[in-house]
């Protein structure tokens, strides 16, 4: 029996690798448990309970990129966050604590380290975030997804495993065999959409009119641009499924011949595992421009093309879609190279190390817990 506490979140890019780890842990043994720690404002407050896992909350804010007053407020909140973290850890008694980035991971992982609980962090991006850079000095293991991140951490702690992918997405993708006659383009910009991508894609339609009978689009717009984008496709006579949010990404990937999207770490992990050619448009306001650094790894491998949003026009995007559609051999090459970067076993490798950390510290049966605690059954994911 093993109990893993996963700390962090805030965005899907941080949280979903943690969900993937949780799925791997609870499927290994019916008595394994996973508990998450996050913030009320983060995406975890909605997603984690829906997935069937317990969630503890701490009140903590980021320190980087704030004005003076906001920084003071965040600093004053830190002691309380540490106290909350110690209480949660004492109550939950995890065998291992894994930080996945985001505000909550800092105080929780640091408190676990001070309590002698084995710790690890998982860095999703090629350019590590502030919290993980700090935590990398004290944790036992640092899991990275890009070779470029290695230089930011103590070499002996680093393990390159890739970004864990949710079991549901992988299993459904492998079962999906969607036949389609038209060249299918999947367009999305994250769960909230991306106005820059939405605008450039609808502008690109003006230069793709002669291909409208051979193209099909699946476009996730987010809430704000849904109606305007839907109208753009309809007015120009293109076949398109325009939705606010795609619930079944595995089927969307299975149907796609080409993907136009941002360059978040989780998205890139999905592209490589699903072996998809892509046009990447990094989020221009990402911290330290980390999405562009992420994208560069795929571009250098020949698996993707990248355009800066500020330099990309609708006409240029249309030209790129046209060229890739006209050269299927190039698309196949990009797909093959994307697949070579994929790491479908990342969650398994991460869970294996968690087991090793538990055994090294507590023995094969983990920490001693009261009979009532020991009989608790791990909440199961709905995935």
UniProtKB/Swiss-Prot annotation:
GO terms for biological process: carbohydrate metabolic process; cell division; cell wall organization; lipid glycosylation; peptidoglycan biosynthetic process; regulation of cell shape. It catalyses: di-trans,octa-cis-undecaprenyl diphospho-N-acetyl-alpha-D-muramoyl-L-alanyl-D-glutamyl-meso-2,6-diaminopimeloyl-D-alanyl-D-alanine + UDP-N-acetyl-alpha-D-glucosamine = di-trans,octa-cis-undecaprenyl diphospho-[N-acetyl-alpha-D-glucosaminyl-(1->4)]-N-acetyl-alpha-D-muramoyl-L-alanyl-D-glutamyl-meso-2,6-diaminopimeloyl-D-alanyl-D-alanine + UDP + H(+). Pathway: Cell wall biogenesis; peptidoglycan biosynthesis. GO terms for cellular component: plasma membrane. Pfam families: Glyco_tran_28_C, Glyco_transf_28. Signal peptide: none annotated. It comes from the Bacteria. It is found in: Cell inner membrane. Residues 364-383 are annotated as: Disordered. Belongs to the glycosyltransferase 28 family. MurG subfamily. This is UDP-N-acetylglucosamine--N-acetylmuramyl-(pentapeptide) pyrophosphoryl-undecaprenol N-acetylglucosamine transferase.
